[in-house]
């Protein structure tokens, strides 16, 4: 299954680039930075379902 390396996160500011990822919460995150910030906030409970929109 797909994984994303979030070891460099959280970051205070995310770039605006659009490369969507689908989280295990069925939410589409606009890019890796936004997704990884959410992963850190969830204490690791949020995982990547797949690349692309949910």
Swiss-Prot record:
InterPro entries noted in UniProt: Bifunctional_prot_inhibitor (IPR051597), Kazal_dom (IPR002350), Kazal_dom_sf (IPR036058), Prot_inh_Kazal-m (IPR001239)
Pfam families: Kazal_1 (PF00050)
Residues annotated as site: Reactive bond 3: 16-17
A molecular function (GO) term: serine-type endopeptidase inhibitor activity
GO cellular component entries: extracellular region
Keyword terms: Disulfide bond, Protease inhibitor, Repeat, Secreted, Serine protease inhibitor
Compartment annotation: Secreted
Disulfide pattern: 6-36, 14-33, 22-54
CDD domains: KAZAL_FS
Domain note: Avian ovomucoid consists of three homologous, tandem Kazal family inhibitory domains.
Stored PANTHER family: OVOMUCOID-LIKE-RELATED, SERINE PEPTIDASE INHIBITOR, KAZAL TYPE 2, TANDEM DUPLICATE 1-RELATED
Protein name: Ovomucoid
């Amino acid at each position: 299954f797909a994984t994303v390396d979030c070891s460099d996160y959280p970051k205070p500011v995310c770039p605006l680039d659009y490369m969507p990822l689908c989280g295990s919460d069925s939410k589409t995150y606009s890019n890796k930075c936004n997704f990884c910030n959410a992963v850190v906030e969830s204490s690791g409970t949020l995982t990547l379902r797949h690349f692309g929109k949910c």
